[in-house]
């Protein structure tokens, strides 16, 4: 959620082999210009550079569940990053939701949706219908 959504992307992209999926809700990810301005470009905290690096190295990026309320203050930046992910071949499930801002009401709903979306790998997985729809 918010800065944690940014953190989820950073951890998932720095260690893609450790994660089955990445969930980011209203992720506080700046634009590429902001990354450069803040001296983050192409470093371990640059979500754009990490995607480019993983693609260049042939690493499989985990599927990403990426959502944002359409009235969120981060909407434009989130849309920009979602487009960047798609352009770079990331398996992204994009969930824009009208009527929500940067708020817990949205995150509570989206966390539940994410848990329904993510592939189960535990002992009970065989008993559950597997699906990845939203």
Regions found by a protein language model. Give the residues of each.
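Non-catalytic cap/lid and distal C-terminal segments of serine-dependent acyl enzymes
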Residues: 1-134
């Amino acid at each position: 959620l918010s800065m944690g959504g940014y953190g989820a992307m950073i951890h998932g992209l720095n260690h893609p082999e450790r994660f089955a999926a990445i969930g980011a809700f209203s992720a506080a990810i700046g634009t590429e210009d902001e990354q450069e301005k803040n001296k983050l470009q192409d470093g371990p905290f640059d979500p754009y550079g990490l995607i480019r690096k993983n693609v260049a190295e042939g690493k499989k990026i985990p599927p990403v569940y990426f959502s944002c309320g359409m009235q969120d203050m981060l909407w434009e930046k989130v849309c920009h990053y979602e487009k960047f992910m798609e352009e770079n071949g990331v398996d992204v499930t994009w969930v824009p939701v009208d009527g929500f801002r940067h708020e817990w009401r949205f995150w509570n709903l989206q966390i539940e949706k994410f848990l329904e979306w993510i592939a189960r790998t535990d002992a009970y997985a065989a008993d559950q219908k597997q699906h990845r729809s939203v």
